[in-house]
Amino acid sequence: MYWTEKHWIKLAIIVFIALPVISFILGSAIMLSYTYWPTDYSKMKMPHIDPMTQNIVLIAHGRGDTPASWAAPLKVILEQKISSPRDTAQVIALDWSAYSSSIFRCSVDGMRIGHALGETIAESAELQSVHLIGHSCGAYVVLGLCESLKAKRNDIEVQSTYLAPVSIYGALFWNYGINHFGDCANFSEAYIDSEDGVAGSNQLIPNTHTFNVTDARKATRSSKSPHIWPTYYYLQLVRSGVYPSLRTTSDLWATYPQGQMEKIDALPHKK
């Protein structure tokens, strides 16, 4: 067969245009199928919810993490701060590590786990308030739980606290977190480091009052990475006893206006 110029042009189109496009489409389809493929979450032990509790604090660690790094220590501090004979409160350091490791799936799995938890928690007849705290991809556990809980029990007051939250949802929606974090809660605050390289973890979250704790890290000369630093800062904040809490202050938006960024240049001092 004699190859004319038209044949070579067709071959070039196939090699340099059609094949890359087909490969991209096929690769994207495989990635999205993996990202959104259903799972039953049987490897995760759902927390027992005390049916008589009036207040719940739930802490969700981030991608590839476990409660041991900061969530479990925070649980201990919070239990010391909020427990009293007249006030029943349950503090949960959620272990969802079996589903938090994938950079593509952690937001999707976190949201689904949050939705399931919200439906369960909504059945607690005595429940009055919930404080949700999430780091990195754990922000989606917080968002999902808030959404499903409010859908069933809008009477329950919800505070959501986001620590260096990841904005990307499902490897596709880059601004999902920025647009949705804090939008279903009665009050929401975020703690970010502006030098964090993770998308969404380094900027104002419009539906929250955002604390920029970058200067506090620099002032203490901390060796912790910008993505981890907000968890450490929040631990110190809770330990100090001066952290924002709907349990103690009903109108937090008056003190911490929504949609504003506040710079913090030092660690909090204990009361």
Give each language-model segment a name:
Residues 210-243:
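A conserved mid-domain beta-alpha-beta active-site/ligand-binding segment of alpha/beta enzyme cores
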Residues 2-42:
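N-terminal membrane-anchoring alpha-helices
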Residues 46-49, 240:
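Predominantly extracellular/secreted Zn2+-dependent metalloproteases
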Residues 231, 235-271:
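Alpha/beta-hydrolase-fold serine-hydrolase catalytic core, especially in secreted/extracellular enzymes
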Residues 49-55:
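Proline/glycine-enriched tight loop/beta-turn segments at coil->beta junctions
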Residues 40, 55, 62-63, 68-77, ...:
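Serine-dependent carboxylesterase/thioesterase catalytic core
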